[in-house]
A protein has these predicted regions:
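Short beta-strand elements that form the blades of beta-propeller/WD-repeat-like
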Residues: 24-30, 35-36, 53-65, 91-98, ...
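Repeated scaffold domains used in trafficking and secretory/extracellular systems
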Residues: 48-58, 83-93, 116-127, 153-165, ...
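N-terminal secretory signal peptides that target proteins for export/translocation
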Residues: 1-2
Length: 364
């Protein structure tokens, strides 16, 4: 058999395991400009032709192929979606796309029509928030059900803050509500006041503009965490972090408040399961209920997702904190990096990729 024919036979056979394996995806382009995904220790082909673009989460990737077709790959199979021009968004678990005014979505292999009068939409891990211009309503898709949040009488707009599994929105009387796990909880009525809602997963926090008290919505309950003004606050997965007026950094989760830093930090950040901050030129992280010194310098670039921190190290390479353990991945300078699940993808300048997964380094 000619080598060329043998190569393409191997590539096509490579699709067979995709139908039975699905433990998260890590999509990237290889040195042949093929679209591949790292799974189960191997880089497996998804498309053997160049693609136009892609958007990916931990479990699915949607992409436009060279013919302009929208497709989904969920770690098991490729799914043809449409040949028409689309606007699409992807989260770790869901995908929504709009063709003209028709808004449709994909959830665990099932396609659903959300509305034929759609406009703006936002896709998160567990829900999709979208506008329906036919009824002038703001709607939500959650747990395989569609529900109207509010009908707007003074002009429809995407007047909502959306977290991974909750939504804060306002009705016609300027009363704010939280939608969480299929239930609606009233926050309060505020007219001209500006509110800064920070949303994560299962939690939301805000500062009351009247009393300056700091409140947390925690799995269906409102908790007044501080009765005095605070500087800054953010929400993660089941917890919030905030900085008080004295520069102290606090972590709140499940009714417990923990001091992270007693020094005025010039930078801190939160996403999903991890919090990072600078303290006296040291870079710290809070992961798995543990305070960890990550570096003796401030990284020029970093990324947070799930329980992973990946950052540019002092020599320009890539290092990562994964589930509380620090790893040096590569010394190649200025490489791009991304996070999928608990895996770190590093795209090298020579058009090859490195994946750090389960304590090992894989390359294509």
């Amino acid at each position: 058999m000619p080598l060329k024919s043998l190569f393409f036979l191997i590539v096509l056979v490579g699709f067979a395991p995709l139908a039975i394996r699905a433990q998260g995806i890590v999509p990237t382009m290889d040195f042949n400009n093929y679209f591949v995904s790292f799974q189960d220790g191997f880089f497996r082909p998804v498309e053997i032709q160049p693609i136009v673009n892609y958007k990916a989460g931990d479990e699915i990737v949607a992409y436009i192929d060279t013919r302009g077709n929208l497709k989904i790959y969920d770690g098991k199979q490729r799914i043809d979606v449409t040949t028409l021009n689309v606007d699409y968004q992807v989260s770790d678990h869901l995908m929504a796309y709009r063709i003209a005014n028709g808004l449709r979505m994909w959830d665990a292999g099932k396609f659903t029509v959300l509305t034929n009068f759609g406009r703006d939409f936002i896709v998160k891990d567990s829900l999709i928030v979208y506008e329906d211009t036919r009824y002038q309503s703001l709607n939500v898709y959650w747990n395989q059900k569609m529900e109207s949040l509010v009908t707007i009488t003074n002009g429809l707009s995407m007047n909502a803050r959306v977290g991974e599994n909750l939504v804060v929105y306002r009705d016609n009387s300027n009363t704010y509500f939280v939608y969480w796990m299929g239930q609606k909880f009233e926050v309060g009525t505020y007219n001209e006041e500006v509110l800064d809602f920070q949303l994560g997963t299962d939690v939301m926090c805000f500062k009351d503009p009247y009393t300056q008290s700091f409140f947390v919505f925690d799995k269906g309950n409102f908790v007044e965490l501080e009765s005095f003004p605070i500087k800054k606050y953010k929400a993660g997965r089941g917890f919030v972090v905030y900085e008080d007026m004295n520069g102290n950094l606090w972590h709140y989760q499940n009714g417990q408040k923990t001091a992270l830093s007693n020094f005025s930090t010039d930078h801190w950040d939160v996403k999903d399961d991890i919090c990072v901050w600078m303290e006296n030129s040291y870079f710290f992280a809070y992961s798995n209920n543990e305070r960890i010194q990550v570096a003796t310098y401030q990284p020029q670039q970093y990324m947070l997702k799930n329980n992973v921190l990946v950052f540019r190290n002092i020599i320009g390479g890539t290092s990562a904190l994964v589930d509380g353990v620090l790893h040096d991945i590569t010394n190649f300078q200025n490489a791009e990096f991304d996070i999928y699940g608990n895996k770190v993808l590093v795209k090298l300048p020579n058009l090859t990729s490195i994946v750090f997964a389960n304590g090992r380094i894989y390359s294509n």
